[in-house]
Amino acid sequence: MFEYLMPQLIMPSYANTLLEQTCKAAVARQIEYGRQRVVPWGISESSYNATDMHQVYQYRAFGVPGLGFKRGLGDDLVIAPYASALALTVMPREACRNLQTLADKGFLGAYGFYEAIDYTPTRVPPGKHHAIVRSFMAHHQGMSLLGFAHVLLGQPMQRRFMSDPLVRATELLLQERVPKTGATLQPHAAEVSAAAHPPAAD
């Protein structure tokens, strides 16, 4: 999910724009998928419950079917709390509720939310419903911090980003509206004639 939402940490979003609607649709699909799988929502690349010979958690991209292009996205079920923190920039009420659910389930550690909760049956210990990935990745904690600051401190990073005159000069690009109709091209008369009478093959 971070591919959709990480830019929102520093770039403002405008109502009824292509960017806003895309981000809201991505979060809505995440919420829907969480309900379908009966787990908290928020899937993004993260560590998961598998370690190497040095007991280091492995890391890879996870996603929701319908949002990602990778095949087999439904084979894994790994929830990354930082994804919900990113969603604070788009759907704050829904994200707060989900973060509260994650906290109530005990997915908080000494430094914030744990890296991930792995619900994939092949990686969950016998007799358990899930496995907590008990690690803290600095970049995910940083994204979470910015998501919390976005809501609690009135979008400070967006204000800072837009205070640069060079960035402000391109602000209109962030305000691109969703097209109401598709563009159509009218062929030239010569093209129509050529298509109607293709040259004979020798």
Predicted regions and their residues:
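Ser/Thr/Asn(+Pro)-rich, low-complexity disordered segments
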Residues: 1-202
